[in-house]
């Protein structure tokens, strides 16, 4: 695939974007870095556990949305981890504590700081919209030394529901005072990208895994392999 591609065949709405709103986990921050730091304590199943943890974490948010049973993402993350530790027979509570602690200081992807600086210099507003609750997001963004790049770090906690419920994307309108058609939304989660596009954002799928598209409502504006390609997509020098 190409590093950057148009998806809808129409003149790009991205050029008129006033604000770039980023998903956090998997888009700006590498959720696999939590397990990577403690690989020795987990053993040969570390990569499989990391994949299962993320899959269960997202699955639980969808199921809770369907049940009308919202809980903070920190709780959901712990519940998903407990399932995975049980699945791989890991009973050491210290491993659980280390992994959850690492989740509060995930590594940003390598291209992220320079990319944000380029967008900021070009006059674009920057924000985060995440399933994470503030008690998770604030320490993570702070540890990354990227907090000053963002005018807002928005959490679904304010809506009491997880992505891709439209109430989540509406937070950007309410908090940032911008129309949906002026928002460039970026997510590595294809279902999140489609949800945001269906809401009305101009959406870029950051397809880090080179995965096939999901057959969901909402037309994506573009697809890129990582965020290093975003400035060029937006016409930023």
Model-derived features with residue positions:
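Short helix-capping segments at alpha-helix termini
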Residues: 42-46, 87-94, 121, 145-149, ...
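Asp-based, Mg2+/Mn2+-dependent phosphohydrolase catalytic module
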Residues: 2-17, 117, 124, 129, ...
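Residues at secondary-structure transition points
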Residues: 44, 48, 68-72, 94, ...
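An amphipathic alpha-helix signature
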Residues: 35-36, 50, 54, 74, ...
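Active-site neighborhood of HAD-like aspartate-dependent phosphohydrolases
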Residues: 9-58
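A metal-dependent, Asp-based hydrolase signature
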Residues: 41, 47, 61-97
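Short, acidic loop-to-helix structural element flanking the phosphoryl-transfer center
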Residues: 74-75, 92-128, 135-138, 166
């Amino acid at each position: 695939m190409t590093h950057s591609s148009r998806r809808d065949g129409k003149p790009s709405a991205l050029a008129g974007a006033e604000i770039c709103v980023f998903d956090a986990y998997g888009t700006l921050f590498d959720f696999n870095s939590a397990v990577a730091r403690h690989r020795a304590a987990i053993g040969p199943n570390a990569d499989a556990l990391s994949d299962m943890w993320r899959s269960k974490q997202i699955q639980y948010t969808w199921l809770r949305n369907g049940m009308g049973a919202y809980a903070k993402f920190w709780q959901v993350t712990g519940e998903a981890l407990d399932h995975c530790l049980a699945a791989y027979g890991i009973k050491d509570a210290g491993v659980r504590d280390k992994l959850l602690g690492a989740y509060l200081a995930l590594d940003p992807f390598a291209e992220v700081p320079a990319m944000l600086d380029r967008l900021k210099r070009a006059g674009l507003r920057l924000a985060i919209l995440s399933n994470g609750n503030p008690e998770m997001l604030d320490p993570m963004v702070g540890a990354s030394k990227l907090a000053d790049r963002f005018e807002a770090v928005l959490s679904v906690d304010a809506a009491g529901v997880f992505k891709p419920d439209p109430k989540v994307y509406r937070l950007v309108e309410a908090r940032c005072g911008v129309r949906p058609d002026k928002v460039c939304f970026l997510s590595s989660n294809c279902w999140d990208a489609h949800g945001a596009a269906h809401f009305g954002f101009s959406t870029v799928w950051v397809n880090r895994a080179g995965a096939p598209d999901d057959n969901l409502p909402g037309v994506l504006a573009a697809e890129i392999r990582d965020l290093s390609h975003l400035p060029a997509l937006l016409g930023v020098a």
